[in-house]
């Protein structure tokens, strides 16, 4: 029997896969537990429509990430911190602070986990910080740390 998997089934298939499985296994386990549905022509068309919609959504997310990357390249996030001699900060600037400042100053909401700061910023001046906006799109933000 040909079935469309609705959920991941360990060792068998992932969600959205179409596979041929034994009739008894399909009727007694997969269909009863709503793990799969029979692969009728109507269900196959619905699956194709879902895949197309998911592809369009993915494409839109990628385009949005590219647009955001271009906007971020033009701006510099301004942060203030107390510092001592030689421009060293008391404390440090973290990705969370950069994310909050970006939201407050420019209205761009970027999750702090997407800001790829190897180690916190501990000096005054300009720093370029890489940002992962999408699995296929990376950009960078200029961060200016000024003395308070």
Curated annotation (Swiss-Prot):
Give the GO biological process terms.
Answer: translation
- Please provide, alphabetically and separated by semicolons, the GO molecular function terms listed in this UniProt record: rRNA binding; structural constituent of ribosome
For whether the record's keyword set contains Ribosomal protein, the answer is: yes
Q: Does the keyword Secreted apply?
A: no
> Which UniProt keywords are present, listed alphabetically?
Ribonucleoprotein, Ribosomal protein, RNA-binding, rRNA-binding
Q: Which GO terms describe its cellular component?
A: ribonucleoprotein complex; ribosome
Q: Tell me the protein family, please.
A: Belongs to the bacterial ribosomal protein bL9 family.
Q: What does this protein do?
A: Binds to the 23S rRNA.
Query: What PANTHER family does the record point to?
Result: 50S RIBOSOMAL PROTEIN L9
The protein, known as: Large ribosomal subunit protein bL9
Q: Which organism is it from?
A: Oceanobacillus iheyensis (strain DSM 14371 / CIP 107618 / JCM 11309 / KCTC 3954 / HTE831)
Q: What is the lineage of its organism?
A: Bacteria, Bacillati, Bacillota, Bacilli, Bacillales
Q: Which gene encodes it?
A: rplI
């Amino acid at each position: 029997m040909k079935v469309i998997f609705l959920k991941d089934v360990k060792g068998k298939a992932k969600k959205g896969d179409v596979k041929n499985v034994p009739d008894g296994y399909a009727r007694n386990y997969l269909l009863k537990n709503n793990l799969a549905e029979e692969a009728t022509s109507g269900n196959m068309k619905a699956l194709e429509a879902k895949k197309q919609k998911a592809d369009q959504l993915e494409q839109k997310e990628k385009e949005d990430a590219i647009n955001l990357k271009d906007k971020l390249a033009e701006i510099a996030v301004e942060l203030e911190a107390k510092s001592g001699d030689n421009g060293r900060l008391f404390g440090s600037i973290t990705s969370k602070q950069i994310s909050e400042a970006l939201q407050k100053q420019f209205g761009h909401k970027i999750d702090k986990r997407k800001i790829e700061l190897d180690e916190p910023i501990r000096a005054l001046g300009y720093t370029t910080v890489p940002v992962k906006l999408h699995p296929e799109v990376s950009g960078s933000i200029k961060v200016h740390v000024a003395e308070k």
